């Protein structure tokens, strides 16, 4: 507000401007005096100005990720005696905030379910396209939280034929990745798609999948596969 009054005071005068803003002219002149004579400010105001510089220094030296608690503790380690509430108040005035740590996400939910038998016996080799599909389910930590990714790879060419990203660990978006692969590759009818049951949740029946017209004769069965990595994975095999 003060820069605006300084800009318009020559044109309209201090009195009319303060009247429109419902403030006393003495308030404006008092602020002007404090700006031009910092030594005449109150002891608390002068200390706040000094603390702001120290807070800004600690904040910048720590990659601008420290919050109130860590800034306060760092100031105490440096011998600067200040209350935590004072640091919180000044950081709010300065518009400084620490980076929030995301809450811990439970990535594996074990459930007792009947596991299907093996179909490929870890022989991840294909003689032709769309003979064997390998799918995986993983998660990525971002500033906004966890993002879950499901993708399906054709073993013959190592090409991703379907993928989906979701902010929640639900089965529907994994089915969407499978459906995208089916629409993209359009495998021949009467082929068998073999799906591994995810360890994070129970794989549903294929009745929940929206079937395209050309896929009405396909049969979906479940199988189980163990990978070298401790993460969920799936296998899709197609038979001529």
Curated annotation (Swiss-Prot):
Keywords from the UniProt entry: DNA recombination, DNA-binding, Transposable element, Transposition
GO molecular function: DNA binding
One annotated GO biological process: DNA recombination
The Integrase catalytic domain, residue ranges: 125-240
Keyword hit for Cell wall biogenesis/degradation: no
Transmembrane helix recorded as keyword: no
PROSITE patterns: INTEGRASE
Function per UniProt: Involved in the transposition of the insertion sequence.
Protein name: Transposase for insertion sequence element IS3411
Organism: Escherichia coli
